[in-house]
Amino acid sequence: MHNWLLPEHIADILPATARQLESAKAAMLERFRRYGYELVSPPLIEYTDSLLTNADPALDMQTFKLDDQLSGRQLGLRADMTPQVARIDAHLLAHRQGVTRLCYAGSVVHTRASGLMRSREPLQVGAELYGCYDLAADIEIIELMLSTLAGVGIDAVTLDLGHLGVYRALVREAQLDGETEQALFAALQAKDRASVEALTADVREPFCSAFRHLVDLYGPEAIGKARARLPGLPGIRAALDDLERLAQIFASRARISFDLTELRGTHYHTGLMFAAYAEGWAEELARGGRYDNVGRRFGRARPATGFSLDLRDMIRVLPQTHPSKGIRVRAADLSRLADEVARLRAAGEVVVVDYLGETAADLHCDRELVCREEGQSLEAAPAHP
């Protein structure tokens, strides 16, 4: 086996791509800052009992684990930064009693790629808002998500909205046992009508029919269908009202669709869920939702809403960036020009020392600092070495 081979779905980032990613990341973080979000940087590795706080089997399966040689405890490489940021809000920023806005950008590592063309080392960028139960907080987060995507040229977006409140209200009122609920959850996720019908055969009405209707409750007209076909439970009415209000607010910014069987993150989220899609993309560009009380394990249960995206997944639409043209200085002249080289670099110029007699183009330079009898001179670089 060649020793330069990397694991599947792991790749090096070369200079041109690295410039694109860093430029886009900086622009996103600056946008977050203008909305009042403060940057935090959690560690790449933590004890698994803090990384895996919500009994989420999917996150557990995605987490690389190893033993700590110092403590003997199990460590995990983070697969998602959201629980880490929730820990920071709940524990390290516990003195803050009002709304806290935090953002982050960093690599996470997955045991398996989440899609055929996706990396196992996503560059996760996201924003979280803590301390506000009101729908206004979700509106701010969705607005920030759409604005962030538009900032990298993705403005023809479909905003897909869902709400766990509908499913959970039905499960609670139908009094399903744990085993049936888990199987029904999987069947609804797969939109497997036959399995849903089999699993709800002994469920009393109106809940039997309601679960079966859920399979069809997706698309632009889903809210109207849901009001007509589902029981008028308070939790369901409130969830549908929220979805309808969000659709009205963002109708001018995105194509709106609904999916009341989109239940990914049910161990993680607690209510509203949303995702952004665009033509030509097989999977979502960004995803988020409400995950109230995620900080309970760290001593402070707080309402929370947020979104995240994988910046590496967007590389094909990110604006091209080009390296700044530099100034070449020949190695033989360096000692005599050292002060001027230092001054130019301090002023923000790129100064490249030519050790091998390369062309200015090879060194990405369009000027040359030369030594002449009458003194130093900054000139246009010749095409030849």
From Swiss-Prot:
GO terms assigned for molecular function: histidine-tRNA ligase activity
Subcellular localization, as worded in the UniProt entry: Cytoplasm
Pathway entry: Amino-acid biosynthesis; L-histidine biosynthesis; L-histidine from 5-phospho-alpha-D-ribose 1-diphosphate: step 1/9
CDD domains, alphabetized: HisRS-like_core
GO biological process: one example: histidyl-tRNA aminoacylation
Assigned keywords, A-Z: Amino-acid biosynthesis, Cytoplasm, Histidine biosynthesis
Coiled-coil annotated spans: none
GO cellular component terms given for this protein: cytoplasm
InterPro entries recorded: aa-tRNA-synth_II/BPL/LPL (IPR045864), HisRS-like_core (IPR041715), HisRS/HisZ (IPR004516), HisZ (IPR004517)
Cytoplasm keyword on record: yes
Miscellaneous comment in the UniProt entry for this protein: This function is generally fulfilled by the C-terminal part of HisG, which is missing in some bacteria such as this one.
Stated role: Required for the first step of histidine biosynthesis. May allow the feedback regulation of ATP phosphoribosyltransferase activity by histidine.
Family the UniProt entry places it in: Belongs to the class-II aminoacyl-tRNA synthetase family. HisZ subfamily.
Record-given protein name: ATP phosphoribosyltransferase regulatory subunit
